[in-house]
């Protein structure tokens, strides 16, 4: 699987920069302006474009005749915006800073779902690809653990400005690594009469394909709760007598999620839809327990357990998108799905701000209820209507890959996509092809 290691390094570096922006923006705004609210406005401008830019970015990626230039260019644009924020925030007029934040945030979908859409071209179908998505999911969780810690450490020993420069350097590394990935020649374009990705094709696929509709609606609902978890953790730790314990709780959750993605997320024998339901339901149960624990230590244990349960959810989501996204809308499905989750998390953060006066244990129970409701929603949507018919060729390819994996061989058959390409190989494909 040539290129997968470089892809994972690029994804980790890009997501490190993305995950660190929330804390870096707030710390830098507080340091230079004395107002955390100013940082919140800038962060909102950074996050808001994700869902709006997602279909545009996905369609542009699908139509690009030079995929290397497109992916490297979007990562470079993201990095440039981060670097500009390091120098402009708190110094330049607010409209200028907000404009830079909007431009940088518009590149965000390619850092998340856009990069994940490349895995299908790097790894042939079968257990190897499922495991690759597990590793890809671990880059999100690894970045979520390390980036805020690194930003806090640099800011504590220096200032928030160098911390944001560190994030820009990580983004530059991601762009450089992405430039070294093998990309397939996209070919002369679709044949006459063949489907072409329009701006609404990703949204149409998310609605029409039952499996995609189920996982997208459920994870979007679940992420309303996840977005509220950080503020709620701070409030909960304060009521338990540890005002600084919110960071401990969220670190426990992030470490648990990383552990879950590296262990439970690599289970390929369980259908991804079932794995997603189990993950959301178990996360809800663990958070319910966290609402009633009497100390920060026990609460951290419950948060870690919730993180372990949440870890496989992203892996399962990526597998479902890869297997059921129509070929012509694959990148849009990945970018739009990621954008919806970011928007849902932002909504959750805003809602918990409005409800901050409520007892924290009530807020934790509400977040847990959203996870359980998401699991029920997935069950209801997945059970509604006939299942999408699987393409015989794709099923046969996956069966051959599983047999070879059982025999200890990872070689690909003559019909498998190229494992050395970061984009899917050209040629006719059925909509169900992963």
Predicted regions and their residues:
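Substrate-agnostic recognition of the 12-TM MFS/MFS-like secondary transporter fold
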Residues: 6-22, 46-58, 69, 74-75, ...
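Transmembrane alpha-helix termini and helix-breaking/packing motifs in multi-pass membrane transporters
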Residues: 26-32, 86-88, 146-167, 239, ...
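Helix-loop junctions on the cytosolic side of multi-pass membrane transporters
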Residues: 121-122, 169-193, 270, 380-392
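C-terminal transmembrane bundle of multi-pass solute transporters/carriers
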Residues: 52-56, 71-77, 239-414, 426-434
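Helix-loop junctions at membrane interfaces in 12-TM secondary transporters
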Residues: 87-101, 291-303
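A single, central transmembrane helix in multi-pass transporters
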Residues: 23-24, 158-165, 204-262, 361
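Juxtamembrane intracellular "pre-TM" segments in multi-pass secondary transporters
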Residues: 1-5, 183-217, 394-413
